[in-house]
């Protein structure tokens, strides 16, 4: 289990999609993606970022709603982060190409498939 992740940016905003649309959330944009779509609106997240300890990431969470985005957040081992975010509602924005079954054990996690 990894205790650090490659993070592109962490910021607060209004969630624009999914079941928490319109609510404030902390967005954690993780680095990396298994696809290289020509229309990607966050291609800068493919390689740009820095490794951060899980505790440092969690310390920057400002709201009960958290969105993990990318790139493709499932390209990294995010289990330790999800464990640390229990008590939050976590939306994972995924491109839909990776297996989500390993994450079904988390009651506080849900998914939005977004291919842009």
Give the role of each language-model region.
Residues 109-116:
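Non-cysteine beta-strand/loop elements that form the S-adenosyl-L-methionine
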Residues 5-11, 24-31, 35-108:
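Conserved Radical SAM active-site core
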């Amino acid at each position: 289990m990894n205790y650090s992740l490659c993070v592109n940016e962490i910021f607060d905003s209004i969630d624009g999609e999914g079941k928490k649309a319109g609510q404030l959330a902390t967005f954690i944009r993780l680095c990396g993606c298994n696809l290289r779509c020509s229309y990607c609106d966050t291609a800068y997240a493919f390689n740009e970022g820095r490794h951060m300890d899980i505790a440092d990431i969690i310390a920057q969470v400002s709201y009960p709603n958290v969105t993990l985005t990318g790139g493709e957040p499932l390209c990294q081992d995010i289990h330790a982060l999800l464990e640390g975010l229990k008590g939050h509602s976590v939306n994972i924005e995924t491109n839909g190409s990776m297996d989500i079954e390993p994450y079904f054990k988390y009651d506080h996690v849900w998914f939005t498939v977004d291919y842009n």
